[in-house]
Amino acid sequence: MDTRIKAVATASMYDMTVASRLGMDKETVQATKEKLSKQRWIDAQNGYPEYIPYFPDKPLEKVPEDLTEPTAEWFRFYALKRGHHINALGGFTTTSNLAFMNYHLLDYLDEISPRPILFIVGDRAHSKFFSEEAFNKASEPKELYVVDDAEHIDLYDKTDKIPFDKLELFFKNNFK
């Protein structure tokens, strides 16, 4: 932890280590690592990494009906005019998950203490468990702030949902 940091706040936090392994058993993890390792060789030979955009290059009028959650939620933001941008088509390089699968991002979460941490999450966020798990692992001082009637993406741009007053007070109190 960079000791210059005085306080940490997250909104709609995602633990990519956990997300990269969700639903996988040990054999599937190993097979995925094998596939991604081979792709790294291909990327090296090509001189650039493979990147497969997750969202369309032009905004859609509506979310495709066959999408399930949380994919439909991502599309409600990134694939529609609401959050679409030509330079933000989602996803990572094909091999990005290999790095996430090889270490746990929250292993040293306790080292943030004694600096305070504020976890902000929507009560309907599919990602809520990431913040709850991180909150449980974190040392004091810490706070889990739940925004009513909000899903993950609402904390990106819905100004009536983003708790600006809470964030302002948190940082004013901790940037002394």
Q: For each of these PLM feature ranges, what is it?
A:
Residues R124-K142:
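Conserved loop-alpha-helix segment in the C-terminal half of the alpha/beta-hydrolase fold
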Residues D148-K176:
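Catalytic active-site module of serine/aspartate enzymes centered on a nucleophile-bearing elbow/loop
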Residues L144-V146:
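Conserved beta-strand scaffold positions in the cores of enzyme catalytic domains, especially
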Residues I112-S113, L118-V121:
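Short beta-strand/loop motif that positions the catalytic acidic residue
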